């Protein structure tokens, strides 16, 4: 890893991708286990908002020449490749509802690639506003967009606007803000906030899919003023939990820090394994609360394997559209890397 890299953000990205995988594994158990449902809601309150905020933090160079072109190559081409691969995979798994090659209807977690591309493009108009107005307008759009039934998962438009405030906040943050979060006092407050958010997820009955940001308010019942207020309330929880999580991320380099540089691989590839586990009925094998430990270990194993040098070597041509790791292995310079 380059010494110029900030271990803090690599740690944050690894922990967040761990939560992404863990959340997807938990999904199979939430219908029959109340605690896992509450834990699932808690994780979904902040794990993607935090990921999106960190993505916004690293989008400060959006005005550089060729930025959009590089972004399209990095996000849109892999999106189209994996849109086809996932559609074929779902067809093989006999999930006809998911076997869809429609390029404007993202398969499962691929929505993030489309939205990330749009968030970067939206920086051009929003950066012309003051920070306060940009956040106010983005939050206003996000609240109002839920009242429009035609804005949904197509082109990931709903999620793009719902999570846009998180991306903008990350864009406006600087290193000093993160230093404040990581202060001793900041960490103490963070623990209290996360505990409070978990209690709210435990005590308030709400549809967990509201946290996805992918559906209009009409999907959850009668559409009233409360619908928009509910989204505002979620923003309070999401930002509070997101900042609290980031306050607790360690700054030192650990064995998992380097894996934080390969979250894109984990994000794109873990869906194949998750779908397979669901297909074989993992929830029928693990039904007790003790299974939570097994699920955590399974998540750790899956995340570490998909972050490995071997997976990078095999998948790099499809994900990064280059063969650097494979060529290094062929030349003999990367053979020992598989064991690292």
Swiss-Prot record:
Main location: membrane
Gene Ontology MF annotations: acyltransferase activity, transferring groups other than amino-acyl groups
InterPro entries hit by this protein: Acyl_transf_3_dom (IPR002656), Nod_factor_acetyltransferase (IPR052734)
Entry's EC annotation: 2.3.-.-
Disulfide bridge map: none
Keyword entries, A-Z: Acyltransferase, Cell membrane, Membrane, Transferase, Transmembrane, Transmembrane helix
Cellular compartments annotated: Cell membrane
Transmembrane parts of this sequence: 6-26, 35-55, 73-93, 106-126, 133-153, 161-181, 192-212, 229-249, 263-282, 291-311
Enzyme class: transferase
Pfam families: Acyl_transf_3
Topology with respect to the bilayer: Multi-pass membrane protein
Top-level lineage group: Bacteria
GO terms under cellular component: plasma membrane
PANTHER family linked to this entry: MEMBRANE-BOUND ACYLTRANSFERASE YKRP-RELATED
Similarity annotation: Belongs to the acyltransferase 3 family.
Protein name, entry field: Putative membrane-bound acyltransferase YkrP
Organism: Bacillus subtilis (strain 168)
The organism's taxonomic lineage, starting at the top: Bacteria, Bacillati, Bacillota, Bacilli, Bacillales
Annotated gene: ykrP
């Amino acid at each position: 890893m380059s010494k110029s890299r900030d271990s803090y953000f690599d740690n944050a990205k690894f922990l967040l991708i761990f939560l992404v995988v863990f959340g997807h594994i938990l999904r199979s158990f939430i219908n029959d286990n109340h605690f896992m449902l509450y834990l699932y809601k808690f994780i979904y309150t902040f794990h993607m908002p935090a990921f999106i905020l960190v993505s916004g933090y690293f989008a400060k160079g959006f005005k550089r020449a060729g930025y959009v072109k590089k972004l399209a190559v990095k996000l849109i081409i892999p999106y189209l490749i994996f849109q086809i691969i996932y559609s074929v995979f779902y067809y093989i798994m006999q999930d006809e509802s998911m076997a869809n090659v429609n390029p404007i209807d993202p398969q499962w977690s691929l929505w993030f690639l489309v939205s990330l591309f749009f968030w970067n493009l939206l920086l051009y108009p929003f950066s012309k506003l003051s920070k306060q107005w940009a956040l106010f307008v983005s939050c206003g759009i996000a609240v109002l967009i839920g009242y429009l039934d035609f804005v949904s998962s197509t082109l990931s438009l709903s999620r793009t606007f719902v999570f846009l405030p998180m991306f903008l906040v990350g864009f406006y943050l600087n290193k000093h803000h993160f230093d404040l979060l990581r202060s001793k006092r900041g960490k103490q407050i963070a623990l209290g906030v996360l505990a409070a958010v978990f209690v709210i997820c435990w005590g308030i009955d709400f549809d967990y899919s509201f946290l996805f940001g992918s559906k209009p308010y009409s999907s959850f019942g009668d559409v009233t003023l409360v619908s928009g207020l509910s989204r505002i309330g979620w923003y309070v929880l999401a930002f509070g939990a997101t900042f609290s999580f980031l306050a607790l991320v360690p700054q030192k380099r650990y064995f998992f820090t380097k894996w934080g540089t390969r979250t894109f691989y984990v994000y794109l590839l873990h869906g194949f394994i998750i779908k397979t586990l669901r297909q074989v009925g993992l929830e029928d094998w693990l039904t007790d609360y003790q299974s939570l430990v097994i699920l955590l270990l399974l998540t750790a194993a899956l995340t570490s394997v998909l972050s490995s040098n071997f997976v990078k070597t095999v998948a790099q041509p499809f994900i990064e559209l280059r063969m650097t790791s494979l060529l290094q292995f062929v030349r003999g310079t990367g053979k020992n890397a598989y064991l690292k």
